Amino acid sequence: MILIQNAHIMPIVGPELPNGCLLAEDGRITAVAPHIDAPEGCTVIDAGGRLLTPGCVEAHCHIGLDNECLRWEGMDYNEIVEPLTPQLRAIDSINPQDGAFPNALRGGVTTACTGPGSANVVGGTFT
């Protein structure tokens, strides 16, 4: 169980809480309120007034398919030799060690749909 206190909470539904608390148990939010007493054995985190929002969903990206260190050799999201490339699959080229994943997490992205680029008429299958 985790209690986050002193957070600027911006929920999807309901009023903004400039100095609120959020209680989560087993990975699920169980309470959001201006004040919540910490249950026994609960881990308490002081957010220090930081913004707390629901996780962001990235609906179209190429995260894990573009290795910036390799320049064009690492761009696995576009195959521009043909206009139709339905055989391309993100799962075949995704790099789970891509440094963009931790950057996205730090930015609040919790879900991402990654796949081939949009340079082709039919570009392939997203993961």
Question: Locations of the language-model features?
Answer:
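Short, glycine/charged-enriched secondary-structure capping and boundary segments
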Residues: 18, 71-74, 127
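Histidine-rich, glycine-flanked metal-binding segment
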Residues: 9, 13-53
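Short gly/ser/thr-rich secondary-structure transition/capping motifs
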Residues: 12, 91-94
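Catalytic metal-binding/acid-base residues of hydrolase active sites
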Residues: 10, 62, 117-118
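A cytosolic small-molecule/anion-sensing beta-strand core signal
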Residues: 5, 25-26, 116
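Active-site loop-helix segments enriched in His/Asp/Glu that coordinate
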Residues: 96-127
